[in-house]
Amino acid sequence: MFWTKKNFDVYGEQGGISTAITLPEGFNTASDRCPMVILMHGFMANKKFHPIPTLAKALAKAGIASISFDFNAHGKSEGKFIDMTIANEISDAKAVFEYVKTLPYVTEIGFAGHSQGGVIAGMLAGELEDDPRKPACMVLLAPAAVLK
C-alpha cells in the first residue's frame, strides 16, 4: 500500500472538523519532509467523495502528502447543515491550513478544491496573500461559482 491515513480532529467555529492525512508509502514524519496539499470537497459531499480520495492517492504516489477534511455539517464533522455558510467553510479551511502550518514535515502547502471546495480554496488563498506560508500552488476542479 502506497499511502496511509491518520485521522484526528481540527476544531473550527462550528466544532470538530473530521480530517485524514494521506502520506507517501514509507514516509516517516519524524525524519522525512514533503509538500502537502489541502483537499477541499464540494457541496453536499465529504472527504470520501470522488475526486478527493483519488487525488490523495495520486499525490501520495508522487511523493506529496495531503490532508482531506469534511466541512462543517458534512461527513463526520460537527455542525448543523442549516448553519453552514461560505464564510464558515472558509473558516474551516483556514483552521486546517493553520494546523498544517504546525506540521514539521511539511515544506510547502498547496490547495486543491472541487466544486464548492474550489470556490473556498480560491477565496481562502486570497485572504492568505500576506501569509508567509501562503499556498505555493492551487488547483480548482470545476469551481462552483464566482463569489464577490
Where are these regions (language model features)?
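The serine-hydrolase catalytic nucleophile loop
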Residues: 44-56
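Conserved alpha/beta-hydrolase
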Residues: 56-78
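Primarily recognizes the serine-hydrolase "nucleophile elbow" in alpha/beta-hydrolase
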Residues: 96-148
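Short beta-strand element of the alpha/beta-hydrolase
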Residues: 32-42
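Alpha/beta-hydrolase active-site loop signature
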Residues: 44, 71-75, 145
